[in-house]
Amino acid sequence: GESMVRQFLWGQRFTRKYFGYTSNCFWLPDTFGYSAAIPQIMKGCDVDYFLTTKMDWNDTNIFPYDTFYWQGIDGTKVFTHFNRTHCWPAPDDLSKHVYGKGKNGSSIKERSVTDRRLISFGYGDGGGGPQFEMIEESRRVADLNGCCKTYYTTVGDFMTDLEQRVKNPSTYAGELYLELHRGTLTNQHN
């Protein structure tokens, strides 16, 4: 816990000094499970929102939520969003993920809570970021008839807007355990 608090504090100090802002988001896209102490640490460091992607990889129990409040050990809650949409901003990919037309169905688990999705794009596992084609395609589909409405935003603004728009989000208490990579950074060994 102490190491994580230091990382938050030094990270916030760095972004304030060199970029002029304080982040309100904790985004861990490629991590194999999350301690139930994280919400308390986040709130203590003025970080309100948590985002990740891999919880959809569970191989035994499907995690029930993608937009919810995560409650830590001490009862502290942080608003959480799982980005289950991994695609370019191409019209057919967006339709598959958002409207459930692909082999895996919709990337939205609880439409009664929200129908909004953060679509992050670019090459991540090796750097590279977004390519010109991805940015251009995103621009072109922004108002394309028959495609879901898209727009550019910051992660912090997306999360703030999402929290204001959700309807009756669930609360999940405890560790976020990723079954696919059992025992990594958790207290569960089997």
Residue ranges: model-predicted function:
Residues 1-190:
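Catalytic-domain carbohydrate-binding cleft regions of carbohydrate-active enzymes
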